[in-house]
């Protein structure tokens, strides 16, 4: 076990999806964590705040003493049992705190007293975070090919089929548009960046990588924004544009936003609450672009959406949604994307239907 006492090969740890028992406070974990980490705090948020205040006013020794008073007795035992259970579940795991300092060492010592020798990450989360940032910058220097196309062109599916494809929207838990949110909440910015870095490292390690294949995205995907080093490279990258018939795009959008999202909401929350959540999801997506539509047009499309929802609820048919989706594409989404694409016209290297783009990618 001695060779695992302190881990410094941070890239290997990230590549292996190494389980991390993260003993930072919940607020720290929410602000940024590594994939595969579970949060089992040594101190809760209020306890950490009290210790921090004590440290500023009375110094390190007083703060340490306060920490031991706050985490003692039954509280200490409950947390110790949770760490023991986590290590038994993940015997190849590591303890991790902010910088590999007192918190992970204290938990390590308490576990050792029970006969468990759990190694820790030297440098803690901060060291892993810096490794992730550096890896993203380094790997973003490789050539990039973008997949473009109007909403409903099947771009994400095409990216997912590529061995060198990186599903940015999947990593962000958002499909990019005002209707793009999923049932899984988005990660914090730092956690998204960490997850992206690990994905890049894994794909790069699996093959001799000539280039990345990414979807043509804006600066932000929902609440997450792309790392600037990657965004700068994407702005200069060649683009293959999917140009599918409008009717085919509508069918993809029907399946994704009306059939699948309805299923996901009702599966998660039950029929009644799921239907309410699904309805609110569609209304929220339309509301988010009300100013760009103009308030009168927004009101008209909202009325049409209400009628479509009533029809879907009574008959199960999603046909009524086409009455607001078609004008939304024609008046808003398609003109917006085409305007953005025109500014990058010099970067376009191929155009064609979905299957032609897929075949072209294979030939590259």
Swiss-Prot record:
Alphabetized HAMAP family for the sequence: tRNA_sel_U_synth
Subunit structure: Monomer.
Domain Rhodanese residues, every copy: 14-137
Keyword S-adenosyl-L-methionine set for record: no
Family: Belongs to the SelU family.
EC number: 2.9.1.3
Family annotation (SMART domains): RHOD
GO molecular function, one term: transferase activity, transferring alkyl or aryl (other than methyl) groups
Keywords on record: Selenium, Transferase
Organism: Salmonella dublin (strain CT_02021853)
GO biological process: tRNA wobble uridine modification
Active-site residue numbers: 97
NCBIfam families in the cross-refs: PRK11784.1-1, PRK11784.1-3, tRNA_sel_U_synt
Protein name: tRNA 2-selenouridine synthase
InterPro entries: Rhodanese-like_dom, Rhodanese-like_dom_sf, SelU
Pfam families: Rhodanese
